[in-house]
Structures are given as structure tokens and as C-alpha cells.
Amino acid sequence: MNGAVLIADVVATSAAITATRSRKAKVAAIADLLARADPRRSGADELETVTAYVGGALRQRRTGLGWRGLTKLPAPAPGPTLSVLEVHEAFERIAAPAGAGSQAARAAAVADLFGRATAEEQQWLRGVVTGEVRQGALDSLVQEGLAAAAGVPLPEVRRAAMLAGSTVAVAAAAFEGVAALGAVGLQVGRPVLPMLASSAPDLAAALARAGGDEVAVDTKLDGIRIQVHRSGPDVVVATRSLEDITARLPEVVEVARALPADSFVLDGEALALAEDGRPRPFQETAARTAMGAGVEVTPYFFDVLHLDGADLLDVSAAERAAVLERLVPAEHRVPRVVTADLGVAEEFLAGALRSGHEGVVVKSLAAPYEAGRRGASWVKVKPVHTLDLVVLAVEWGSGRRQGWLSNIHLGARDPATGGLVMLGKTFKGMTDEVLAWQTERFLELETSRSAHVVHVRPEQVVEIAFDGVQRSTRYPGGVALRFARVLRYRDDKPVAEIDTVDTVRSFLG
């Protein structure tokens, strides 16, 4: 059944968003498009599809398509006729084939879809498949547009999306009103977006944000973020990107089932330890959670979001900590000290570093659990300054690096526009093993190339160490990193969680 909104409408909105740097104009364009998909007229399916598409994403997690499969397309249609629902149904058919004959079936479905699309629509469809739709419509902008279109408060939309795990999941509820959004609550077994920490250059700066009040200082473990849900015997273990990894971590499931409660939601880290109790290299923990085989991991928890029918998101961190202490034994809690004294905090940080950990996270004791938000309530402090950035492009190496992709172009999020801002390049910190891996990885993400540069889909997150930040007119963000070097690639982190250019600017002297 054809929907009222055409894919041409999405393409036009995408172009309008790309053409302006004004956040207000971007939000207005998104709101206008979403209003045309009002579910009270055309149903929730169309609205959810439009919401996903204006954010530059498909509703299917995987389609089996890559940019190489889109190099030979049929001639474009002379005029726009495709609805968003027809495109969604086409991608359902494209994603479905498996087994013998699946490639031919997928190719036929692709040819049928693209043959019905205009030249502009073909370009947009190719971009959304390959991740090139960079109109700056990040999720926060889509949420603002949804709130405006539905006439509901933005905080209500944000909260519901965080608890449901996506904006698409609550789009229809927004048009039903505040009561429907308020009915979206934490559901045991359905992961929520995790609370995130901002950065500070040192402990003094982190404690200053608390205004002299006592804070919790947690050890920052160098593991994989996990969220553990239990309802009776049923346990779900999810990553920070909400991927279900329960089957890969039976030892975490065992710990969860042993806790003295019927239902709960815990936030924490999974960490692989050496025989002396020190953390193993991060790559070993990451490999274990990704593949389900390898070294054993131990869960450590630092927060509780729900216990036996009671949601705890809105209670203070101090109250949640008391609940956590009653529920989880000390050997599975992240080490913590509560203090307002800088000397005590610095001594605790030194002890964490001696034990092989990354640093500390300073947490307000009065704050609620702000799912999906990065704010001043949690502040991480590490002796080595690091940023999580995204790779925008890579340059071919020379000399002994001939034939390898070497110099990576680094980008941060611009919260003002929703786009990505380049901060500089680096080829430092790369072993031969890393060079070989990233060459293969970035060729998989390639979208185009020039003589020396391979442009890639902005999907790969990299953790960068740096010595400082300086003002620069060379890059659009007005800042550049000094002595940037690769610490590691972070396959566990989605691009939505990379650092902002504002965070980078906070490190200016």
C-alpha cells in the first residue's frame, strides 16, 4: 500500500538539511517532513520509516548490500513515484534472501527498486545504504523535529527514546501526546541507552564542577560496557550500542542469576583479568565479547536502574549506590571512594593507575541516571588525554608503509549543526599489525578515492591520545590536536558516542 510521503520528499528534506548550517532551519525541515507522516492519517509504519530515513538510516539492521553492489544501476525513472513504504518494503525483500540463489534474488530486487527511482533518489538510496547520507540529521536533531511536529515537549521525546532504545520506536507515541510518551518506561529485558561521561583535564577541574559537594570517585575500568537485565531466570546482557551478547558471556549470566533479587537492571563493565588481578589488554576483552571465545571476563557494576519492580532512574546516585551495595557483592562492584577532598581523590586515582586501570570517573551524588546523555554529572579523568573520534578518510602510506593505508583523517561531532568536523590527521601509534588491519577495514568502508586519499563511510571509531589542543585556521572547527596518536580502534562504540568539538575545545589552555 502506497504511503502519502514519497521518497522524493525525504530526498528534498535531506538536501535542505545539507544546504544549511542553521540548527533551527534543520529542525524546521525535519518537523515539516514528519508532520506529513502523521500516524493518525497514515499509520505508524510510514512515520517510523520516515523518521529512520531522515536520520540517514534504514530500518533493516543488515541488507547484504555494499557500495560495490551499487556500482551498476539501471537507468533512472523519469519522475518521482516511489513512496517511503514502497522503499521500506523493497529493502525488506533485499535483506531477506539467504542461501542458494540469494545473490541473484538480491540483485533483482535492487534492480527493481533503483529502476523505479529518479536520478536524485538513486543517489540518496545509494548514500543511505553505504552510510554516506551526511545531512547532519543526527538523532538529537530528529528528536527536536519530532517534538516540533507532534507539539510535545522535547524532554519527553528524549526520555522516551532513551528508554525505548531509539527515536524511531517512540515516533508514533509522540503524536499521541505527552501521556503516551510518559507511558514509555524502563522495561526489564529491553536495553536502554547508557549514561555517558564528559571529560576533564584533571581531578581539580572535575571536582570544581561539583561546587565543593561530596562526589563518588569510581575507578575507570578499561573493559566493555555492559547492561545486565534479569527477570526471574531470564538474563539479557547488552553492549553500549544495545547489541545482545548474552550467549557470548555465560559467566556474566551466572553472576547475574546468583544475585539475591527477582528482577533488576545493572550498568557496568566486563573485564578480562590476568592471574595477578591486573586487567588484560583491552583487545582481549573486546575480542571475547565480540566472538564469544577467548579469555574469561568478570563483570563489575557501578549502577542499578531497576530492582524488583521499582525503577530507579530518577532517584539520586547516592540512593542508587546504597541499593547497589545491598544487591551486588563487593567483588563485583567497581571500586569507589566518596569525598569532596582533592587529596583523597588524587590518592584514589594514583591507586587505580597502579592497579593498571585507566583513571577515574567523578560522579555527582545528587544526579539521576540520565540514560543516553553525556553531561556534567559524570566526568572522566585520565592521565593520558584521549578522545573518541571517527575516521573520515585515510591516505596511502609511503616509504616502508607503501601499499598500506596510513594517515587517518579525524573527525568530531559538531553539536551546533549535527555534522562532523575534521580535527586533523595522524599516522602515529600504528604497528604493522594495525596498518594491515586498517587497510583491510577502510577499503571495506570506501566510498570514493583520489590519487592519495580513500574516503570512507564515517563508521569506525578510534581512540586517540594527544598532548594538547591548539587553535587552528586550517580545520573548520578552529582547533587541532597536538601529537595525536592512535591508542586503539573501538568497535564497541557507535559513532553517535564520539566526542564533540566542544569537548576538544575544552582542552585549550
UniProtKB/Swiss-Prot annotation:
A Pfam family per the record: DNA_ligase_A_N
Enzyme class name: ligase
Keywords: ATP-binding, Cell cycle, Cell division, DNA damage, DNA recombination, DNA repair, DNA replication, Ligase, Magnesium, Metal-binding, Nucleotide-binding
Catalytic activity: ATP + (deoxyribonucleotide)n-3'-hydroxyl + 5'-phospho-(deoxyribonucleotide)m = (deoxyribonucleotide)n+m + AMP + diphosphate
Active site, UniProt feature: K220 (n6-amp-lysine intermediate)
GO biological process: cell division; DNA biosynthetic process; DNA recombination; DNA repair; DNA replication
Record-listed ATP binding positions: D218, R225, R240, E269, F302, R374, K380
Needed co-factor(s): Mg(2+)
UniProt cross-references to InterPro entries, sorted A to Z: ATP-dep_DNA_ligase (IPR050191), DNA_ligae_ATP-dep_bac/arc (IPR022865), DNA_ligase_ATP-dep (IPR000977), DNA_ligase_ATP-dep_C (IPR012309), DNA_ligase_ATP-dep_cent (IPR012310), DNA_ligase_ATP-dep_CS (IPR016059), DNA_ligase_ATP-dep_N (IPR012308), DNA_ligase_N_sf (IPR036599)
GO MF, any single term: DNA ligase (ATP) activity
EC annotation from Swiss-Prot or TrEMBL: 6.5.1.1
Matching NCBIfam families: dnl1 (TIGR00574), PRK03180.1 (NF002868)
Protein family per UniProt: Belongs to the ATP-dependent DNA ligase family.
Role of this protein: DNA ligase that seals nicks in double-stranded DNA during DNA replication, DNA recombination and DNA repair.
Protein name as catalogued: Probable DNA ligase
Organism name: Nocardioides sp. (strain ATCC BAA-499 / JS614)
